[in-house]
Amino acid sequence: MKFNCDDNLGKLAKWLRTLGYDTLFSQDIEDTELVSRALKEDRVILSRDQQLKRFKSAEKNLFLLSSNRPLEQLREVLKKFNLKPEEKNHFTRCLVCNTVLIPVPKKEVENKVPPFVFKTQEKFFYCSKCDKFYWAGTHVKNLKKKISEQSLL
């Protein structure tokens, strides 16, 4: 399932990406463009904006959230679409741009990541769009804990 979050749902977009869902997020996008792109790419529009109901063509692709809190919004989306996030898909997308991350052999990141990170981490991933390397640092541990605490699995 693919999503398109409107410009007020940046935190929800990051959470969906964290769980491995293909989720677009564009700031300053016109409603017509948001709807057009969602229809063209068969994406569900996630929004709190009741004005989007005026686009009859988007009716089946629109889910209006009731909460304004990101984790509650995430829970709404998972429930509505009966999604069961699989741990193998967690942290497989760039949280910034949504690109699928590419596994990279450790030897290829030497001198491209901080020395301490290179010494302490074994797995690395690369975002070809952002040109950045990622690894499972303490932020990943903290996000996994939050996912577990929120019963999102």
Which residue stretches match the model-derived regions?
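Long, charged N-terminal interaction/targeting segments
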Residues: M1-N89
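Short, glycine-/small-residue-rich phosphate/pyrophosphate-handling segment
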Residues: T92-R93, P105
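Short functional micro-motifs and their immediate structural scaffolds
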Residues: T99-P103, W135
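Short cysteine/histidine-rich zinc-coordinating motifs and their immediately flanking basic loops
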Residues: K106-K112, H139-E149
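Short linker/helix segments within small regulatory modules
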Residues: N111-F124
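Surface-exposed, charge/polar-rich loops and edge strands
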Residues: L152-L153
